[in-house]
């Protein structure tokens, strides 16, 4: 859901920027650019979190592969 929300925020920012530039409202254009930047940052943080989870799951999986009789915590969600 976060990915969709981030994309929507980025698109909304692009629209604001375009309207601001078309009407000569530099403040609105700046606000649109800021919205796009914020959406890009949120997306990057979300992607980084996903990569960390994937890495943790691989590490946990490698321990299970070595000794399946040892109990391990659930995979990171």
Curated annotation (Swiss-Prot):
Q: Basic and acidic residues composition bias: which ranges? A: 30-56, 64-77
Q: Which domain of life is it from?
A: Bacteria
Quote the SUPFAM superfamilies the UniProt record gives: Hypothetical protein YjbJ
Q: Where is this region: Disordered?
A: 1-77
Pfam families given in the database record: CsbD
Stored Gene3D superfamilies: YjbJ
Q: Which family does it belong to?
A: Belongs to the UPF0337 (CsbD) family.
Name the chain's protein.
UPF0337 protein CE0198
Species of origin reads Corynebacterium efficiens (strain DSM 44549 / YS-314 / AJ 12310 / JCM 11189 / NBRC 100395)
